[in-house]
């Protein structure tokens, strides 16, 4: 990052070396501005790019590395081809720059202050894994420095009111549209016994709408580089509709037949079931024994004398999950417990009665499958606990909720033995009494998630078949009766593999389009003030009709990509996993509906934010899929971050501008 910035500054210095003018003495402001602009672009990449690929990563359609590669390509292309138009709006649309005539150096200092304030708050939000609007950041920072430099004169307060309105309009409109779209997808495709025929029939329509909406969004920006600024709105509309129809025909005659054959081949190669493709993993695992003897255990059993009386079976065994506050607070909570403190925890108790104690000498450790109803039921209870993730009665071993889908262990039914956390590993013992000398330690044998789920169900029956004295799940301060209804409600949430094959490329396509449009729109958040700084320095006047230099847009695009690779995973994790589980079908509904909302609302004059639209869609679809799967506490934190974005970025910018105005300049 430092080398790229220094190289750009060197080139810039060479270009302006022959320029002489009244602002030559303020070249240091230009250099500082380039450095801060790159940091700002870095923060935009770390935070805002999650809007495009967060749901795609969360649904498993692409890996994080693949998302970073695709986003780097399309963000850079979008910033170069589309960024010039939007940079003009950021440069001239918030304040009246004519007020700074004859005091151009004050506007230069203000641009540096605005970039600094926006960068600091976006980096802080990225650290906290909170998606915020980069546009609102730079607008708040611009207003902040203007209030210090010129007071309320020249500030366009109507723009600020539009921003406040967008906090509520954006998530509401996009959420409603996403929920409606997903409702029809679920009704006519997902809930059918065989979803493939209806899915194939709907595929051309989905592709046509996706291509048409995204093409219209890109062309309507009027990018000068591509000549779109010369097209009338009706011309853009006709081109978009025509391109969508052509796409639908290609998909119907070329893509659908090939996809149908591919699905049929997958179905034929697997045993018949409700979800045939899922059985392939079972068939592969059936060739290898899952439970193997443990050498240490065998030696202990062989050395034991037959005269040793067997220990009486315990009447009840209980494992308690102490659930802490958040991933970042795990270590803090555990330290507090070590120091004798009492961190705030809630307890999830799993009680296993003696009816199912294994007699074959094995203790089984089951990993919960990410798409099982039991996993989602536990996920719901952890969310409602509103506290974090420490496991074990003493907080010995923290569970990371967001590390992977296998972090909620020991929640599966069929849990055997008494579990005691150790420093190096967890072992299962025959009895929970630590003082009894004859207790034998048994190693837990890890199973793959889907196989362990099937084995547990085969051994113990479905959760409905188990009595209260055998396996129960209860939670302090929560109605235990909600477990059964939540489990039944969430069983049909996961997409069948056939459905995933239908929607996965659609979701990748919408994510790429979104990344391209995002590069054109949000590069202005990083480069808009820098463009103003550069043009003022080069021309010596605040009134400049010069076009935005392409190399400045490329500079911002590179900074965005660096931020994405270094720190982008944090907010991607929030958008794709933490708020609610995402599937390919729900991810596609989120992407398409939020894109439609942005295009329609922007063109009828309603203030919307891409970030707010995407978060609203994620929450609405997650709530529709499962009433209890949305982390409402996290959504509350995100909304509070939206609320303080403009004031905080404005205050930071105002403080830096005051330093410039009263101390440095």
UniProtKB/Swiss-Prot annotation:
Top-level taxon of origin: Eukaryota
Protein task: Sodium-phosphate symporter which plays a fundamental housekeeping role in phosphate transport.
Record-linked InterPro entries: Phos_transporter
Coiled-coil regions listed in the entry: none
A cellular component term, taken from the record's GO annotations: membrane
UniProt GO molecular function: phosphate transmembrane transporter activity; symporter activity
Protein name per the record: Sodium-dependent phosphate transporter 1-B
Taxonomic lineage: Eukaryota, Metazoa, Chordata, Craniata, Vertebrata
Main location class: membrane
Keywords for this protein: Membrane, Phosphate transport, Symport, Transmembrane, Transmembrane helix, Transport
Listed transmembrane segments: 26-46, 67-87, 107-127, 163-183, 202-222, 235-255, 499-519, 548-568, 588-608, 638-658
Localization annotation: Membrane
An example Gene Ontology biological process: phosphate ion transmembrane transport
UniProt record similarity statement: Belongs to the inorganic phosphate transporter (PiT) (TC 2.A.20) family.
Pfam families: PHO4
Native species: Danio rerio (Zebrafish)
């Amino acid at each position: 990052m430092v080398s790229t910035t220094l190289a750009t500054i060197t080139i810039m210095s060479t270009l302006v070396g022959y320029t002489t003018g009244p602002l030559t003495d303020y070249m240091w402001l230009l250099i500082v501005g380039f450095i801060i602009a790159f940091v700002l672009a870095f923060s935009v990449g770390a935070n805002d790019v999650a809007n495009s690929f967060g749901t795609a990563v969360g649904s498993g359609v692409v890996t994080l590395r693949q998302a970073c590669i695709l986003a780097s390509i399309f963000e850079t292309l979008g910033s170069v081809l589309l960024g010039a138009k939007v940079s003009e709006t950021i440069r001239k649309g918030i304040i009246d720059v004519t007020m700074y005539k004859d005091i151009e150096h004050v506007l230069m200092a203000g641009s540096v202050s605005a970039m600094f304030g926006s960068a600091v708050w976006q980096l802080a939000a990225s650290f906290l894994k909170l998606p915020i609007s980069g546009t609102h950041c730079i607008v708040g920072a611009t207003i902040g420095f203007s209030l210090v430099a010129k007071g309320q004169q020249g500030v366009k307060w109507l723009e600020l009111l539009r921003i406040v309105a967008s906090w509520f309009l954006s998530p509401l409109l996009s959420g409603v549209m996403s929920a409606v779209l997903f409702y029809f997808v679920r009704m006519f495709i997902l809930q059918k016994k065989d979803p493939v025929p209806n899915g194939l029939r709907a595929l051309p329509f989905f592709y046509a709408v996706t291509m048409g909406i995204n093409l219209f969004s890109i062309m309507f920006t009027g990018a000068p580089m591509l000549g779109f600024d010369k097209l009338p709105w009706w011309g853009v509309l006709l081109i978009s509709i025509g391109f969508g129809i052509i796409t639908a025909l290609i998909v119907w005659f070329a893509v659908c037949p090939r996809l149908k054959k591919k699905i049929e081949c997958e179905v034929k190669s697997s045993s018949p079931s409700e979800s045939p493709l899922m059985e392939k993993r079972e068939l592969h695992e059936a060739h290898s024994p899952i439970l193997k003897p443990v050498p240490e255990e065998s030696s202990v059993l062989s050395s034991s004398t037959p005269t040793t009386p067997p220990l009486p079976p315990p009447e009840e065994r209980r494992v308690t999950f102490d659930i802490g506050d958040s991933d970042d607070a795990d270590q803090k909570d555990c330290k507090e417990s070590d120091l004798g403190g009492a961190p705030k925890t809630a307890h999830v108790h799993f009680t296993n009665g003696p009816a199912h104690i294994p007699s074959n000498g094995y203790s089984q450790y089951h990993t919960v499958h990410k798409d099982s109803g039991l996993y989602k039921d536990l996920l719901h209870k952890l969310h409602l606990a509103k506290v974090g993730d420490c496991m074990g009665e003493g907080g010995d071993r923290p569970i990371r909720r967001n590390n992977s889908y296998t972090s909620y262990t020991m929640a599966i039914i069929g849990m055997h033995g008494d579990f005691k956390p150790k420093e190096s590993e967890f072992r299962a013992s025959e009895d929970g009494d630590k003082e009894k000398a004859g207790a034998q330690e048994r190693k837990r044998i890890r199973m793959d998630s889907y196989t362990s789920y099937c084995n547990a169900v085969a051994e113990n029956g479905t959760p409905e078949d188990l009595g209260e004295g055998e396996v129960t799940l209860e939670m302090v301060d929560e109605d235990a009766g909600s477990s059964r209804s939540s489990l039944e409600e969430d069983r049909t949430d996961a997409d069948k593999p056939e459905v995933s094959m239908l929607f996965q490329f659609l979701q990748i396509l919408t994510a790429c389009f979104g990344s391209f449009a995002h590069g054109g729109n949000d590069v202005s958040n990083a480069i808009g003030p820098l463009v103003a700084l550069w043009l003022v320095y080069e021309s010596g006047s605040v009134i400049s009709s010069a076009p935005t230099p392409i190399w400045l847009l490329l500079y911002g695009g590179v900074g965005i990509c660096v931020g994405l690779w270094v720190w982008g995973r944090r907010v991607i994790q929030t958008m794709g996993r933490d708020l609610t589980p995402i599937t390919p079908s729900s991810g596609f509904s989120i992407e398409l509906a939020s894109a439609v909302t942005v295009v329609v609302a922007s063109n009828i004059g309603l203030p919307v934010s891409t970030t707010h639209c995407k978060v609203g869609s994620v929450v609405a679809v997650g709530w529709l899929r499962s009433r209890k799967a949305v982390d409402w506490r996290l959504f509350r934190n995100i909304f509070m971050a939206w609320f303080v974005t403009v004031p905080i970025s404005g205050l930071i910018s105002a403080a830096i501008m005051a330093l410039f105005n009263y101390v440095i300049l």
